[in-house]
Amino acid sequence: MLYAACGGTQRGISFNDLLCGLVLITRGTQAEKTKFLWNLYCNDAGTFIIKSDYVRNVNLAPFESVSLFAQSERVNFEQFQDWIIKHRNATVLSKWLLSDNCVSLTSELETPTFYQSLAGVTHLEEKDIGDLEKEFWRLKNTSQNGQIDLQFLGPLISPPIPKNALAGLFNAFDENRDGHIDFKELCCGVSAACRGPGVERTRFCFKIFDVDRDGVLSHDETLQMINVLLLVAKENQESQQYKDLTKQLVISDLLEFGQRRSPDGTPSKLTRDNVSLTAEDFMLWTVQCDLRLMQPLLDLIFELCHIVFGLWPQCKHMENDIVRGWLRREERRPYRVGQFWYLITHDWWLSWMQYTQHTTHTCDYCKRTASQRTAVDEALVCDESFNTHSLEQHDSYSLGSGTGSASGSGSASSGISAGRHCGPVRPGPIDNSNLITANPFRNVRTLTGEGGHLKRDTPLVQNHDFELVPKSLWKALNRWYGDNLPLPRQVIQPPNSDVELELYPLNLRILLHQAQPSQTGVGGGTQLGSWGSTVSGGYGVLASGGGYAAIAVSSVLQPPKRYLAYTAAFSRLATVRQVGEFLCEQLRLKSEDIRLWHVPQLDNGAILLEEDAMCLKELLIRDNDQLLLEIRNKDLTWPEELGSLATAQCGQGAGTPGDRRRLTRSSIMSVHAPGATGLHNLGNTCFMNAALQVLFNTQPLAQYFQREMHRFEVNAANKLGTKGQLAMRYAELLKEVWTATTRSVAPLKLRFCVNKYAPQFAGGGQHDSQELLEWLLDALHEDLNRVMEKPYSELKDSNGRPDKIVAAEAWSQHHARNQSIIIDLFYGQLKSKVSCLGCGHESVRFDPFSLLSLPLPVENYIYFEVLVILLDGSVPIKYGFRLNSDCKYSHLKHKLSTMCSLPPNLMLVCELWNSQIRQVLNDDEKLRTQSAKELYVYQLPEQSMRTRSNSGLSMHIEQGLKDIQRSSALITSAQDSLSSLSTLQTSSHRASSRVLCNGHVSGLDVEGEAEVGTDVSQCNSNSNYNPIVSTYSGNGSGDNQVHELLPDEAGKVSRCFGKRECMPHSLFCFKESLILSSSPENTFMHGAAAQQKRVSSAKLLHTESNTSSMSYTNHSGENSMESSLTEPIPLADLEPVSSRNGSGGEDCSYRTSPNDSSGLSTGHTLGASLDVDEQAEEGNAEDHDQPDQITTSQPETSSGVYSRRSSQPPHKAGKYLVAVHRKITRHDSYFLSYHKTRPSLFGVPLLIPNSEGGTHKDLYCAVWLQVSRLLSPLPATTEQANHAADCDDSLGYDFPFTLRAVKADGLTCAICPWSSFCRGCEIRCNNDYVLQGALPPINAAASNTSTPKMNAKFPSLPNLEAKRTPEYTASLSYTPTTKYFEDFTIAIDWDPTALHLRYQSTLERLWVDHETIAISRREQVEPVDLNHCLRAFTSEEKLEQWYHCSHCKGKKPATKKLQIWKLPPILIVHLKRFNCVNGKWVKSQKVVHFPFDDFDPTPYLASVPQETILRHKELLELKNDAEMTMATNEVVSELDEIDAPSKEVKEELPNQTGSTKATASPPPTGNILRQSKTKNAVRRQRLISTSLTKTPIVDGEFEDYHQHRLKPDVDQFDPRYRLYAVVSHSGMLNGGHYISYASNATGSWYCYNDSSCREISQKPVIDPSAAYLLFYERKGLDYEPYLPNIEGRTLPNTASVPLEVDETEGELKKLCSIS
């Protein structure tokens, strides 16, 4: 039977069937195995098991046979499933398959999975954890920041959780206080809140109200608790008993409880003004309180964990209570706008109610009443074996209503109703097909998840045709049963109406344009129609969608075709903007690349939806209407615009789509402003449209063409122009723009004219708008040049003549050849001065300009972010700085050294990849921009550094890891690393000082084998070090204590893991050793050393957080850190290694003389009898008089970081090893793999000091020092243990990891040959040496070098000496650093239990941002202003090539300086964002701020016009001050008497000020006057220039060098400009887009984006990083003088111009074709 069930036949069995059968037998779930047994015993139809056939094939006992076929001769699957679960031993196959240890191809307990580890320490089963994981990742993926934090979780659980309890509930889950809930915390919290015993559930509630986590509810916390409990209780369905309950009654009950708790009847300390509860009192009050206020909250949290977090109910009756309780609570709340409710057909709801309400006497949950549930442990499991397999299994088993109906009909035919006796059948997936109508567009993709069209022919009634459930409850039912057709509906609030549920949203058809056939023959319609995605949520909810293929543009204009692409449902209150944004997110489009059109059903035309803020109802869009989604082409053209052009030119119509405007209230009331008309994009012509729009809004030029004055000045004979074509086409387009009533026009004729006369702008590519503008102004000027015949002129050399004469001469010659309105408005004059550095000769030249091209500052800096990882295990710190791109990594080290005070030669700069050190960057390498923000710098150990150290945690390794992990220091540091990272930097100095003052002494810098004497004192009076004596006494418990497993604890072990003999040792120890004990004394030392209770201070070597380097004791000997020999070393054999410090003291660190090294196995230690106070006194009294005393060097502190004195010798880098984190996971393909497990790397590699003579235990201690912050600490006591934090008691006696020797890849062994398939030989935690002098010497010149090498001393690790020859060892001294990593690496193999339960992955890449990060980032993107660019433009620069000096008669070095001599009325500023760098054009994204009003370019004028303006302003201010002085002379008199400085100010004024003494006046006037006189007292320094000496500025004889036509009241010497237009370029160089902003004649600002034109605020927000062209107009400019006088003039003969028009029309018609 088994062979046949697996697919075997007489001809054999296929491999696929055999494999599936083995997987089912070994890995199948209980439900799958039950279904497998059903298929073995059922009939051929697979519907029933016949009693006669079953008894014949299976030898059943009478009892089992009667229990199975008691009601009928045949049973269905549901009946068989219930029976076989209860009688697993009924048959041989069921006993074999359904037992816990059935068949296993590999032992699951060799490497426990994450599920097994969590199941072992929580009240959850492995399947529960798997279900929670699915929901956890779904929630995490929907979060915006990828984390389940309070901001994300709040809207999901509140309501029903009260808002004032939201933070407390979140903190109860967030045990490590990192601000988000990880999966382990979720499982532990759900276990404690739902599956734990009543005591644990109550303790979880206590954590909700204990906000400060001090174990006591303060008065405020107690009042908050009462408010929450009352609010939840009154929302409960059984709220009658809580209806009249008030806050005062609860407080009274608490006071009575406190009185009962008082010993001997003494008065309670609790009062109404001071009500507080301890954790014990809280739990007793919840049990003894008659109010039972805690039960509603417990029920709410119980429901929350099932509904929101994804926990499955343990039985169907529990499911009924959860669903009904959640639904009743939600129904009592009013509708909220935006809330989604889901429709469920009433038939399915009834079947579910019957299934879940059916109770039996066998279910323990059903036997409990509401009053009993508070006293009975709610973690009991229903004996009915509620089927909780996945939704996919439901489908594969073909269960549901169909099976139930078949069973009923069969039973009815035999006269026995099986359904009546076995109970209702589990309902199948939710099927709402009877609520909706048939979809006529079944083959069209739906973008929204509305589910379908509800029936309208028959009215649907709630509670009769359908039921409504909230979104959260629907998701839970969907997880448990599945669904075929969700029907979400949204709550809306129409204007002037109440909220309502919108059952019938608008179902719209979305049309797209059919792609024009390309050369490949693939149309866009097929591609768009083939998109597929899974839609989740309701209509309007985001869903994943495909991309969009850009529509190709045919070279022949023709109307685009439309086709039905999608359907979507939207609320009738949705706005056009919301619809557009939804479609963009669904189809991955940009909002600026789409437009929406309404296509009426009986009309082929389209109406553009311009009103973004109007809703669909206001736009008269009805159900089943059509919306056209227009997608802009790749060349930035709009298909509808091109189609309208084709239609118009072919005679089919004369209007554009924009002509049709919907007559809405806003469109009727709005007036189409003149000039507010867009321009069609004719194929990447945005550069032309933007330039034209700003010229159209240049008011004097616009008036010139609007009045048709150009027709009197067209110069068709000018060969340098376009024969008047451009001027005529430009005028026609300008007139059309300013008089059009349509929203956009097509600049076709002007485009053809530009292509003809400027072929460089032809084609479909993108061009530079500035280049077009410059050509356009020049071509318009030539077409309108009033000079018919240009005279010949030759520009003379300045030859030392005054600038005024040379400039007038140059402008006169230019004006004689060029006279037009373009010259009058846009042209100015630049002064160019070249100074010879050899003789000082100056050559001045004046040239006209139409726009100023200002180069942007190009900074050749690279921004670096470097993460510094220290050896002390502190939180890494990230630094930021900027370096020149030509620098090397040696400069980076020195720059970083100034920030973190870490010596450059103690830095290892490297790049990480895949949790490994990919490459070490040498000092002489040039900086790379690719890894600028991903650099890691490790602190290298000093040559004398020891490894077992951590003063911050006071780590005494002999004390045992259990007590270390429970120490308050570790708990505090672990919490502070998450909750106080923002203050870590500022408090680092205080922490360093505090630790240094605790009396810890660092080790001594000693080389060789030596012994340190006990009489040690300090020789530096300023030293903070005081030697201490650390003692430790064990409690003697050790291994002598044997704890008996309690009965309930044994049941927990049996429930979680089955039989004990199958459990792994570590997990069994955790389950059995539940009572904490201290570690045995000999855990980390040998027996002889264990008898010694005193521990020397020199054994415990400390480093401080953020320490750059310290002096460490260098040990050697058999037991380097456990040696207790006390024979002193002669002080004469020590050599001083540190010089005198600046305070007069001396750092007397000594080293042993190399000549005295005898190679003896001797240790050294400090005496254990020194007193701290005596040592301090001796150090202060005998500072300089004890030359034979030994002390440690004291590093100075600065902001918590040690800084070295300049007098100290350079630090020498020591040897080190690289360690990588590794976890062992079960191999997925265990059938084919040689190994059952596979290693994988994770986290950030470590750098482990490996000094000479170090032991394996030193390696373990050094690793523990750096990884201890990544583990969640064990609670200090068992009373403080949380629900699942104390994961494994066995970890207290050992490190939670194992070190192994591997290769650089971290996966294979570095010792064994590849054929052994070894994953790395274990490095045991003992006192064997790691190194024995086999390493080559460290190259002093290289700072990033190390040569790790291991010499094994135990049999399990072979000796590495056989692999190394002397030649090979010597060569390693000169091998690059990366070579060393290829030989030997340490793999940190984490214990699976510790990795799963205590390792905090969020801390792996946690760092603290140094203040330099913000400073450097700000400097990197620091903006500049327009003045900065103008200063750079007018500053003097040295010429790269030598200049031919006319005076020296040869080439000489020279400088050049540009300045503005004459300002134009319209000043165009060009910001040069496009530059050629190394042969490639790049765009600068530099932020340039520019003024809108009162832009004064005076500082950038040449000296003569600049001094003229400044002197005029100065005299004007003096005149104003004099007038004010005359009016308030009395005030001046009083001020002179009071304030002496005012007298000095008055004496310095010139005589023409006319200041006299005056009487007193009110104080405000006197203050203003005094400030004004003080300001003017400091006379302006007049400009000094050779030009001013030749052209002096005479007061009263000022000359206006700009000659602007201004209005009468405007000062001609106040050249202030206002911004009226901007051209912006967004995107990259080759694929960007131009838009323009302009202010029209009324002062309103408009944004012109091709055919789109919209009004914006008065001062538009323009991206300063995209501004490209700035247009300024002189304030007070009078337009009339610039316009020619045409009175009495006749039009010239322009007969030749219309001929060109006909030619243009002909070219245009060639593009039209009728398809």
UniProtKB/Swiss-Prot annotation:
Residues 1171-1180 have a biased composition (Acidic residues). One of its GO terms (cellular component) is Golgi apparatus. Disruption phenotype: RNAi-mediated knockdown has no effect on the number of mitochondrial clumps and mitochondrial membrane potential in the indirect flight muscles, and there is also no effect on climbing performance. However RNAi-mediated knockdown rescues the defective mitophagy phenotypes caused by mutations in park; reducing the number of mitochondrial clumps, and improving mitochondrial membrane potential and climbing performance in park-deficient flies. The keyword Phosphoprotein applies. Ca(2+) 1 binds at residues 174, 176, 178, 180, 185. Keywords: Calcium, Hydrolase, Metal-binding, Phosphoprotein, Protease, Repeat, Thiol protease, Ubl conjugation pathway. Its EC number is 3.4.19.12. GO terms for biological process: protein deubiquitination; proteolysis. Residues 161-196, 197-232 form the EF-hand domain. SUPFAM superfamilies: Cysteine proteinases (SSF54001), DUSP-like (SSF143791), EF-hand (SSF47473). Deubiquitinating enzyme that acts as an inhibitor of mitophagy probably by counteracting the action of park. Possibly functions by hydrolyzing ubiquitin attached by park on target proteins, thereby reducing park's ability to drive mitophagy. This is Ubiquitin carboxyl-terminal hydrolase 32. It comes from Drosophila melanogaster. The gene is Usp32.
